[in-house]
Amino acid sequence: MGMLVDEGKIKWEDRVIDYLPEYQLYDPTTTRELRILDLFLHNSGVGNADYLWTFMDIPAKEMLDRMRLVKPSYSLRSSFIYQNLFYVAAGEVIEKVSGKPWEAFIQEKIFTPLGMNRTAPKRKYIKDNNQVVPHYEVNKKIKPITYTQDHAIGSAGSVWSSAEDMAKWMICMLDSSKYAGGRLLKPATWAKMFKPATLVPDAEFYPTQQLTHPNWTTYALGWFQQDYKGKKINFHTGSLAGLTAIHAQLPDYKLGIYVFGNFDHAEVRHALMYKAFDWFALDGTTDWNKDFLNLYSKIFAKVEKGEKDFEAKRVMNTSPSLPLADYTGKYSDPLYGEFEITLKDNTLLIDLNHFEKAMLEHWHYNTFRGPYEKDWYGKATANFILDATGKVSKIDFEGMELTK
């Protein structure tokens, strides 16, 4: 986007609806006032809507169309909440202004000039058979899993790269976007990318703050920021199921680090980041590996305890209000799509938008619970809601309510 700003084709202060007039949000004021800059700052007030690509396979334009149904968590620019789909919207703006799909634009403007020959904007464009395999821990065992579909999320996080190519990108960013043949951005535009723009509250920052104790945490154009040992650091993680990454900078020392992992939420990435800063610039003997292992072990233990507490609240010896066949059928919602429930071998099966499935066994009363087909998703919980006549009228599936 900064390149288009430098070319005079767009301004950071321009309204999004002037480029995407069909892009409507739940709050008309936010729709009217949302600026290009806001797309990168997670300050719109619109809550997380990742279910639009984790529970369905729909084109980017349809995902954005459904955003009009996502209720805001707060008013525009009044706080911070992470929202991937605004980066999808930014990709659509880039296509509208440049006349090229986002993936073609970054290939031409970034990957090719930097010689990033083993980098692809989406996995389907990878020509190399030597590809990472994602892994997940399921039932205390680590197993390979299938790739997350990335064709719709595009500009929100679908770039695939190699260690060598990421080094080229990192060096370019540390050197004010310069490369052998010129520079990607004008100096002022490059500087704007790293200028703090939004305060990040503790609840929205990484748990690492419990160990590094930053005095401030901010967000710039695609970068989390904090102070560490009196110095500003810029960094960002990346995660798809079974895959992790982190890219960080210590600008005062022209030091950068990147970590790729083929295991879901391999938080050693944070330990390596701070250890690299200590080793190569800021000194320090902190055993970040031990400290982060202890921190995240407690976090994971808390999650596990929550699951056990949920299991313990099950009311035994209850029965569903209706015959299982009465729970079958199609349930729909303009935002969440269509779920279909069928009955097989006395067990309910749910199909989520023809994208994912789960087995639902009776839990208690009119609540059913069971494993997803992709077992690394864990277990699904569905509560059926009856109307005044005693018939099933709705389903509440993991907080998503659909009508029969």
Regions found by a protein language model. Give the residues of each.
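Active-site helix/loop module of the DD-peptidase/beta-lactamase fold
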Residues: 3-47, 68-71, 92, 96-134, ...
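Extracellular/periplasmic catalytic domains that process cell-envelope and extracellular macromolecules
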Residues: 11, 27-33, 74, 126-128, ...
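Second-shell loop/turn segments in exported
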Residues: 24-27, 49-54, 75-79, 92-96, ...
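Mid-domain, small-residue-enriched loop/turn segments at the edges of structured enzyme/sensor domains
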Residues: 35, 85-86
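The feature captures the short pre-catalytic strand/loop hairpin that immediately precedes
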Residues: 61-73, 137-151, 227
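Catalytic loop of the DD-peptidase/beta-lactamase superfamily, centered on the K-T-G motif
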Residues: 95-101, 107-108, 112, 144-404
